[in-house]
């Protein structure tokens, strides 16, 4: 380990890949404390549909940045950066290693690249974007964004109108994408790279075969329904102060159940769309991870900036025991803890 930089571990992966289970098992072997990197786990009262660790699991392996917002409250990338930097520093002061675990790739990327200063809002540009959306739909506007800034577009659902609009607005106002602005400000020294301050070990856990993940996603969504997902969303629905323009309610699974409660979907259609939306989320997460090493290689040749893939099956497709997955992770991470 580089003695001039304190260690930090990233544990990333698509939804339903086993990230949380691995993180809690690693805690039994390494002096780590867990920080959640998930844009939905921040919300209180949203437990089943987010696959939030149970109270018993959280008591055994506490996660920071879980249950820190009401669903009516916004939570931005900038909020996450402030919270994550604070928790990382606190864990280091205690002599432990921060292990950041989750699937919100935009948060991980923002940590590595820093949060660049973006141009101020332009009402005329935003009005034109909204006019295009009204005429052609938000998926059309999202495609326009993907053509100029595929990295940012990959993490934004086409129906997430506010984020799509803002990202495209930044490009039209400045002539540069959000991705370009972040990289330029980092190169100029305006944003000090995360890896300049920390010794980072990055792991991505995933099945080798996408079909295996799709099967897990379907099984997990049915399990969530059996555990009371509809009732959980109903409690949110009946509050009266929540609506589908809020990021919390647009979360995968929640939006589909909300539409079911709003009589916009039949039950079977809600189930099918919930599974499809979750698979689409996993696809976006894979898109980020596939480009991760390319992006890292362009920025740094440091061993500590490289992504280590950890597959949950052998090359022959045989599932690895959980103990074997932990052993593989420890083989990569042990130098971090020395």
UniProtKB/Swiss-Prot annotation:
Arranged from A to Z, the UniProt key words for this protein are: ATP-binding, Magnesium, Nucleotide-binding, Transferase, tRNA processing
EC number of this enzyme = 2.5.1.75
Q: Which cofactor does it need?
A: Mg(2+)
Q: Does the keyword Nucleotide-binding apply?
A: yes
For this protein, the record's InterPro entries field holds:
Dimethylallyltransferase, IPT, P-loop_NTPase
Top-rank taxon, per record: Bacteria
Identify the residue position(s) of the site Interaction with substrate tRNA.
104, 126
Segments for region (Interaction with substrate tRNA): 38-41, 162-166
For this protein, what is any one GO molecular function term?
ATP binding
Q: Gene3D superfamilies from the entry?
A: 1.10.20.140, P-loop containing nucleotide triphosphate hydrolases (3.40.50.300)
Q: Name one GO biological process term.
A: tRNA modification
What catalytic reaction does the record list? adenosine(37) in tRNA + dimethylallyl diphosphate = N(6)-dimethylallyladenosine(37) in tRNA + diphosphate
Q: Which residues bind ATP?
A: 13-20
Positions annotated to bind substrate = 15-20
Cited Pfam families: IPPT
Instruction: Describe, as the record does, how this protein assembles with itself and its partners.
Output: Monomer.
Family membership noted in the UniProt record:
Belongs to the IPP transferase family.
Q: What does this protein do?
A: Catalyzes the transfer of a dimethylallyl group onto the adenine at position 37 in tRNAs that read codons beginning with uridine, leading to the formation of N6-(dimethylallyl)adenosine (i(6)A).
What is this protein identified as? tRNA dimethylallyltransferase
Upper lineage is: Bacteria, Pseudomonadati, Pseudomonadota, Gammaproteobacteria, Cellvibrionales
């Amino acid at each position: 380990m580089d003695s001039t930089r304190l260690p930090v571990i990233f544990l990333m992966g698509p939804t339903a890949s086993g990230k949380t289970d691995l993180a809690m098992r690693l805690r039994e072997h390494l002096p780590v404390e867990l920080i959640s990197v998930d844009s939905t786990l921040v919300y209180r009262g949203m437990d089943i549909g987010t696959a939030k660790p149970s109270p018993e699991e959280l008591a055994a392996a506490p996660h920071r940045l879980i249950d820190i917002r009401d669903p009516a409250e916004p939570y931005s990338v900038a909020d996450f950066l402030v919270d994550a930097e604070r928790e990382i520093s606190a864990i280091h002061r205690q002599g432990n290693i921060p292990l950041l675990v989750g699937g919100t790739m935009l948060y991980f990327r923002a940590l590595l690249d820093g949060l660049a200063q973006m141009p101020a809002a332009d009402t005329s540009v935003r009005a034109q974007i909204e006019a295009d959306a009204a005429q052609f739909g938000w998926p059309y506007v999202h495609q326009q964004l993907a053509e100029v800034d595929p990295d940012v577009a990959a993490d934004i659902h086409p129906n997430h109108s506010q984020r799509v609009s803002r990202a495209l607005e930044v490009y039209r106002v400045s002539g540069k994408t959000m991705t370009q602005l972040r990289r330029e400000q980092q190169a100029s020294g305006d944003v000090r790279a995360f890896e300049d301050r920390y010794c980072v070990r990055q792991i991505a856990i995933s099945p080798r075969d996408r079909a295996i993940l799709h099967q897990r996603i379907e099984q997990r969504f049915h399990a969530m329904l059996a555990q009371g997902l509809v009732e959980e969303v109903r409690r949110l629905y009946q509050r009266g102060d929540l609506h589908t323009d809020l990021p919390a309610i647009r979360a995968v699974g929640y939006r589909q159940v909300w539409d079911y409660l709003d009589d916009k979907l039949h039950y079977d259609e809600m189930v099918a769309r919930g599974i499809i939306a979750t698979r689409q989320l996993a696809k976006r997460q894979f898109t980020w991870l596939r480009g991760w090493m390319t992006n890292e290689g362009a920025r740094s040749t440091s061993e500590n900036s490289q992504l280590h893939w950890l597959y949950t099956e052998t090359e022959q497709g045989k599932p690895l025991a959980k103990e074997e997955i932990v052993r593989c992770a420890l083989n990569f991470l042990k130098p971090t803890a020395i």
